Amino acid sequence: MNNSNSTVMIFDENNIWKILFRIAPPVMLAQLIHAMYNIVDSYFVGRYSGDGLTALSVIFPVQLIVTALAVGTGVGVNTLMSRDYARGRVQRANRTAGTGAALAVISWVIFAVLSSLFMHPYVATSAESPQAVEYAVTYGRIVCIGSLGVFLESIWSKVHQAGGNMRLPMLAQISGALTNLLLDPILIFGLGPIPALGVAGAGYATVAGQVVAALITSSALRRPPKLRALSRYARQIYKLGYPSIFMQMLYTVYIMALNMILAGFSDDAVTVLGLYYKLQSFFFIPLNGLQTCIVPILSYNFACLAYDRCKRILYDSCGISLVFMLVGVVSFECIPDRLIGLFSQEPAVLAIGVPAFRVIGLSFIPAVLSLMPPVFFQAIGAAGPSLLLSVVRQICCLIPLSWLFSKTS
C-alpha cells in the first residue's frame, strides 16, 4: 500500500501528543457523526411516537451486536496490518485487508438470517406495549437485514486507519450521517409523493446512511487470498479482534439484561435506559476516539520494542480522556432534564430519567480508568486479564446487582 511509508513517519514521531492531536480529531469527529445516527433517529422518532422511542431503545442492544462483530473484526484487521507495516510486509497487509472484507460479508449473512428468525421472541421480552413490540420488530429487521454497510464500512475504515489515513473514514461517517439526517424526517413523516413510513422510515434512513459510508471507504477493497490462506488470515484477525468483540458482546448482554429487568416496571424505564446509552455514546467520544487511535500506535511501537513509548502513550491518553469526561459529568449532574427533553417531554420519562442520569453521571470519571488499560493488552495481543475483568464486572456483578436492587428498592 502506498501510504505505508507515511504510517512509519506518523508513528515514529517522538512527540506523542503531536501524534495524538494529529490523528485523534478526525477519528473523534467520525465517531461523533456515528453517534448521531441513533441520536437523530431517536429525536425524530420521539416526535412521531412514544412507543417508537421505546422500540429504538429495545433494538439498540441488537445494533450493538452488529457493531461488536464489525468493529471487533476491524480491530483485528487494523492491528495485524499495523504490525505488518512496522515490519515492511506491505503485500501481507493487503491480503489481510482482503480477508477482512470477506469476513464482513460472511458475518452479515449469518447475522441477517439469525436476527430475522429471533427478532420477535427477543422483543417480546423487553417491551410490554403491543405497539412498541410491533415498531421494534419492524425497525429491528430493517436495520439488521440492511447491516451490510456497517460491516463493510467498519472493516474498510480500519484498513485506512492502519495506513495512517484518518480523514477518509471521517468523510465517510459525515456523509453517511448527513444522508441519515436528510432522509429521517422525509421517510418518517412523509414529504409530497413520499408516504409517511413512521418508525420503518427511520430504519430505512439509517441503512441508507450506512451504505453511503461504505461506498466512500470502498477504495480499501483488496482481493482476498485463496481459501486456505484466507482461513489462516481469519484466525489471526480474530485472535487479535476477539477481545474487542467479546467485551462489546458483554456490554450488549448487560444492556439486554437491564432492558428485561426494567420491562417489568414500565416501557418508560426501558426508554430512559435507551436514551442514556445513546447520550453516553456522545459524551464518551473522546475516550472511544483515543482508544481507536492508540491501538495501531501501540501495536507499531510494541512491534518495534519501544516499550517505554507504549506506557507513555497509555498514560497520556488516560489524562486527556479524564479532562474531556468532566464535561459529561457536569452535563448529567446539572442539566439532565434538558438532555432527556431533547427526545421526550413525557412526565413519566422525565420523572424516571432525571434522578437516574444524576446517579449514573458520577461513574464517568472511573470509567476512564477501567476502559483505557484493556486497549493496551489488546494492542499487544495479551487481552486475557482484561477479558476476565470485563466478565466479572458486567456479568458476575452488575447484572445480579441490578436484578437484586430491582427487587429490594
Where are the regions a protein language model picked out?
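Short alpha-helical transmembrane segments in multi-pass integral membrane proteins
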Residues: 1-27, 81-148, 194-242, 298-363, ...
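Helix-loop-helix hairpin linking two adjacent transmembrane segments in secondary transporters
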Residues: 145-149, 153, 157-161, 167-214
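Small-residue hotspots at the loop-to-helix junctions and early N-terminal turns
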Residues: 50-61, 136, 140, 203, ...
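Transmembrane helical elements of multi-pass membrane transporters/channels
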Residues: 22-41, 142, 153, 176, ...
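Transmembrane alpha-helical core residues of multi-pass small-molecule transporters
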Residues: 60-63, 107, 175-180, 205-213, ...
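N-terminal transmembrane alpha-helices
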Residues: 11-43, 47-48, 64-76, 80, ...
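Small-residue-rich hydrophobic transmembrane alpha-helices
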Residues: 53-113, 150-164, 168-169, 272-330, ...
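Helix-terminus/linker motif at the lipid-water interface of multi-pass membrane proteins
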Residues: 32, 36-54, 123-130, 186-197, ...
